[in-house]
Design a protein with these regions (language model features):
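Helix-rich C-terminal or lid/interface subdomains of diverse kinases
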Residues: 4-11, 140-144, 184-188, 192, ...
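Charge-dense, low-complexity intrinsically disordered segments
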Residues: 21-28, 32, 77-80, 133-140, ...
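Juxta-kinase regulatory segment immediately upstream of eukaryotic protein kinase catalytic domains
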Residues: 2-46
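Short, P/G- and charge-enriched loop/turn segments at secondary-structure junctions
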Residues: 47-49, 205
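ATP-binding pocket architecture of kinase catalytic cores
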Residues: 49-169, 173
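Solvent-exposed, charged/polar functional surfaces in cytosolic regulatory/catalytic domains
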Residues: 37, 152, 192, 196
C-alpha cells in the first residue's frame, strides 16, 4: 500500500487520480465483489446498487433492515490506504459536535477484498451543487455555519503536518502528520507544480 508522504495535493500528485472512475462503470466482477463484501458485513444477502457519485471513488447504495447505507470504494492502481484516516477524522470532528456521517465499517488493507472501502451513513439529500444552481441555497446562512464549524475543528491539535500517517493510526490509534515541519510539507512538490504551470503555459516569465 502507498502512503501519502509524497503527496501535497491528492488530485495533482497521485499517479493515477481517476483510475477508480475511468472504465469501471460496467465492471461486473468488481460489482460482484462489492456485493459480497457488503453482504458479509451485514451477515446476509443485501441488494447493492450504483449511486453514480461524482469524484475519485466508486459509490454504491445498499438497503438493510429499513435503512440505506452509502458505500465508497477505492480500487486505484496506487493502493491508496487513506480511507481509515478519513474515518478517524470524521469521528474526531463528530466528537466535538460537528455534524458528520457515521462510519460503520472501513478497511483499506486490501487483505480480504481487492479494494479499500467504507460503509457509512447515507445522507438522503440533494447534491449541494444542484441545489446551488437551482437557487435553493441560503449561502449567507450556510457560509456562517460552515465558518463556525471550521473554527471549532481548529480545536483539534495533532503532531506533524500534511497528510496523516496511516501506519501510525493503525498501530497506535493516533493521527499524526507525515511531515515534521510545515515548511517541509509546503515546499514538498512546489518545483514540480510550478514547472507544470509553466509548461501549460499558465505562468509566464
Amino acid at each position: 500500500m502507498a502512503n501519502r508522504s509524497g503527496i501535497y495535493y491528492w488530485k495533482c500528485d497521485r499517479p493515477d487520480a481517476f483510475f477508480a472512475i475511468r472504465g469501471q462503470a460496467d465492471n461486473l466482477e468488481l460489482d460482484n465483489e462489492i456485493h459480497d463484501m457488503v453482504s458479509t458485513f451485514f451477515g446476509e444477502d443485501v441488494s447493492v446498487r450504483k449511486a453514480c457519485g461524482q469524484g475519485n471513488h466508486l459509490t454504491f447504495l445498499a438497503d438493510h433492515d429499513g435503512r440505506t447505507f452509502f458505500i465508497r470504494v477505492e480500487n486505484g492502481s496506487d493502493g491508496d490506504d487513506y480511507m481509515e484516516v478519513e474515518a478517524s477524522v470524521l469521528s474526531s470532528v463528530k466528537a466535538i459536535g460537528i455534524p458528520a456521517p457515521e462510519i460503520f465499517a472501513v478497511d483499506s488493507s486490501r487483505s480480504k477484498w481487492p479494494f479499500a472501502y467504507q460503509i457509512m451513513e447515507n445522507m438522503p439529500y440533494e447534491d449541494l451543487n444542484k441545489l446551488l444552481r437551482g437557487g435553493a441555497l441560503d449561502l449567507q446562512d450556510i457560509m456562517f455555519k460552515l465558518g463556525a464549524y471550521v473554527a471549532r475543528w481548529q480545536e483539534l491539535e495533532f503532531d506533524g503536518f500534511g497528510p496523516f500517517n496511516t501506519e501510525k493510526l493503525r498501530r497506535h490509534g493516533l493521527l499524526e502528520g507525515l511531515h515534521k515541519t510545515y515548511r517541509e510539507y509546503y515546499f514538498l512538490n512546489m518545483a514540480k507544480h510550478l514547472d507544470y504551470l509553466k509548461k501549460k503555459p499558465f505562468l509566464t516569465k
